[in-house]
């Protein structure tokens, strides 16, 4: 069976995602579409607006298989996110990875990926790091502000291509042009497509604009409970106050004395966004800081970080997805394709289980990795 993989967050699922899946399948002539999706915390450095089970159900309206991306991937840099996602795709024997981009020129993106790999090994790169500049700024400067680097999806696409070249040369890659909405659009401005940011804003504001930009047959899923950063902050504040400076120093992505900034500013902070602004330095982007804070919330240490894939958690599958999974188990009998978590296999998913428990503690929801069987229908 020919497969196409999509590296996703679906925060939440919308018409643009549906278009991406359908185009990916069409352009690759794939028999099965596999969505590799972030769990309850996403790359923006925040909790997903809906839990992973609801979002997997949304995705199953169009995709055939939904696989959970390791939690630490979503709370890492773009390169580590891409590396683990590509390794999951390889574990799933994906033939082609299809990603969305504003550029849509795969040749240009591959050339940029090669150039960035060379830049990262240069003395100029090391010098600019010592000057305290952020990674995105350094790359932009050394590539003479290449216009393709102005859009986040192009940047992430380049990370996928770098990871494929390094870890899974057997996987092909294609780019699909994003339609209409831009990644950071804060308001819904189109009758069919909108950014995830604008849809989340609409949902949180409790208006009905999001109705126009999500698939009609799954709109009932968008009235389920959702979670925001405002709900997270009291728990985060408690965690930072309760932890020692030394303990904060040992949290994943906390470096160069940042634990002292956390301690210095937490008592005066009144909300999440105020706190993040107070922590900002020229070395770190806002997104990096937010991911760091989620690592503090989840108490993720460097030793917890996944580097290789030893098992994957199947969140959702339809009949075609089930058939593909059966095929994989025949071809790779030694691999762990887990559809239901229990005591015998829970050790593979320690971070994901903990993230779900903390997400539930804050949101008041009850679905866990143990009481929620693999999703097989979305209606």
From Swiss-Prot:
A biological-process GO annotation: tRNA modification
Domain of life from the UniProt record: Bacteria
Key word RNA-binding present: yes
Binding-site residues, ATP: 7-20, 100, 153, 178
EC numbers on record: 6.3.4.-
Keywords associated with the record: ATP-binding, Cytoplasm, Ligase, Nucleotide-binding, RNA-binding, tRNA processing, tRNA-binding
Catalytically driven reaction(s): cytidine(34) in elongator tRNA(Met) + acetate + ATP = N(4)-acetylcytidine(34) in elongator tRNA(Met) + AMP + diphosphate
Subcellular location: Cytoplasm
GO cellular component terms, semicolon-separated: cytoplasm
Main location: cytoplasm
InterPro entries, sorted: Rossmann-like_a/b/a_fold, tRNA(Met)_cyd_acetate_ligase
MF (Gene Ontology): ATP binding; ligase activity, forming carbon-nitrogen bonds; tRNA binding
Family designation: Belongs to the TmcAL family.
Known role: Catalyzes the formation of N(4)-acetylcytidine (ac(4)C) at the wobble position of elongator tRNA(Met), using acetate and ATP as substrates. First activates an acetate ion to form acetyladenylate (Ac-AMP) and then transfers the acetyl group to tRNA to form ac(4)C34.
Protein name per the record: tRNA(Met) cytidine acetate ligase
Species, as recorded: Staphylococcus aureus (strain MRSA252)
Name of the coding gene: tmcAL
